[in-house]
Amino acid sequence: MKVAASLLATLALGPLFADPETCPHGETRTRTVRMLPGEHWWGAATWWGERMPFDAQTDAVIDIRTDGYANQYQSFLVSDRGRYVWCDAQTTVTIRDGALTLVSDGAPIALVEAGATLREAFRAASRAHFPPSGQTPDLAFFAAPQYCTWIELTYGQNERDILAYAQSMLDNGLPPGILMIDDTWQAGYGDWRFDPGRFADPKGMVEKLHRMGFKVLLWMCPFVGMDTPAYRLLTTGINPKSVVREKMTGGFLLGDEAEAENPMDRPAAVRWWNGKSALVDFTHPNGRRWFKGECDRLIADYGVDGFKMDGGHLVFYTRGYRAFADVPSGLQAQAYGRVCLDYPTCEFRNAFGLAGQPIVERLNDKGHTWADLRKCVTDLLAGGLLGYSFLCPDMIGGGQWVAFLPGSAFDAELFIRSCQMQALCGMMQFSASPWRVLDATDQRIVRETVALRQRFAPRFVELAKACAQTGEPMLRHLEYEFPGHGYATVKDQFLMGDFLLVAPQLEKGATSRTVVIPPGTWHADDGTVVVGPTTISVPTPRARLPHFLRR
């Protein structure tokens, strides 16, 4: 266990996790918490947001010992009655018959009475377990829309089309922002150099994008293709560009067999969505050093600004592969995520124990469906209440590329409502090109929606700075800001900080919606003034995003 303790120190986890000595293998602890009458709970995993708040009628099992649900997860639940439950380690959370039951692999499970409201409980938990770093991610994430080449180019990323994609955004009146170049820019997984067959002058491409006003991020993952030069170098020490054998001390990749004397002896072939590959062991200094060295080289050689870190799913670390450090799967996954802390312009999608940190976290891929549009809102609310202040929705219209292929059941109305939902939630991300998939009328709505977003951009930047100090979510539940009004189950609208109420249309074909107006005086986008608390009905023609500014 000395190796595990050393890893915790290396990762600078501080009080986020108990010393591994308190989590002996094979021993479990159980804690059951009875719900109070009318109590509501949030937490455990962002992906479960649509089922939140949990109450006496909930029947669910959330097992974050084996699955992170491809997003943020933590053994933390918080209630609107001022209570929270916390465990440093991963747990299985069963919610049934009006009770929460948490089971850990030995780590203590605490119930804390912190106050009387959701906000009081959250703030107390934040101070005790995931204090804010005081730092923000790159403020460019909040200052303008983001753009990702995934939907348009998928597995065919190339220099010419990337430049054309970026230029099309400017030509159609959208501002430059962060541009993410997605998977297959590289020669291979782990072979982190631009594919020379598709990128004649990658450094020149990045320079052109910079002159256009974009910041450039490259897609990265922790996998190493087992037929790449990188794999041969990491496993044998042979540099494929020469006959020189380099000094390699091992520890780069997860091992396949527990009985192997050294994990490097037989790297595991890990199945993921692009086949089978070796997986970098971030619990070993060599694995971390090699991966970070590749990132630093890309910045130095090509001038890129940061990275879109993908592929950090917990399930890749729960299959019995051998790591250098004898730590739980969550810490193995977290060790990869911690790489993001070295790069302020970085996006991540999976997180355990990284609440309070200056990392932009994206929601898991959403489908091109109305149900998943609604799920974007509930998951953003849930992730914020797990302690992730800087959350980005998935791509506008959804991140499942097959939905945008010719002949697919594309829904232009859904695309517009998705664009509106994202416009005022702090960050928005285009991938499918509006100029390809929409007609002229809907393209105009997109431009107007982005213009609206840009009017609020300075406020979003200031809100991000404030949340870096307080640890609070940028995007907030009504119950968080206005306790005692019965807002716990309102989850189709949200607040940005305490100043902006946003109520997007989330139903297909609907031309009006109900909006819950909390206490205060609110100036609506249509020029009316509404005094809360009250509930109103507002028209939602295709071009309207209902929002209310607090005075």
Predicted regions and their residues:
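Bacterial N-terminal signal peptides
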Residues: S6-A12
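Aromatic- and carboxylate-enriched substrate-binding clefts and catalytic-loop regions
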Residues: P53, P175-R447, E479-F482
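Extracellular structured ligand-interaction cores
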Residues: N71-S75, D80-G82, Q90, A144, ...
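Catalytic and substrate-binding clefts that recognize carbohydrates or anionic sugar/phosphate headgroups
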Residues: G14-A140, E159-D171, E481, S537-R551
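Carbohydrate-binding surfaces of carbohydrate-active enzymes
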Residues: S168, N172-G173, D195, K208-K215, ...
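Short, glycine-/Ser/Thr-/acidic-enriched flexible segments
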Residues: R83, Q90-T92, E152-L153, Q186, ...
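Generic recognition of flexible, low-complexity loop/linker segments
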Residues: D63-R65, Q72-Q74, G134-T136, Q167-M169, ...
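An acidic-aromatic substrate-binding cleft motif
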Residues: A125-G156, P176, D183
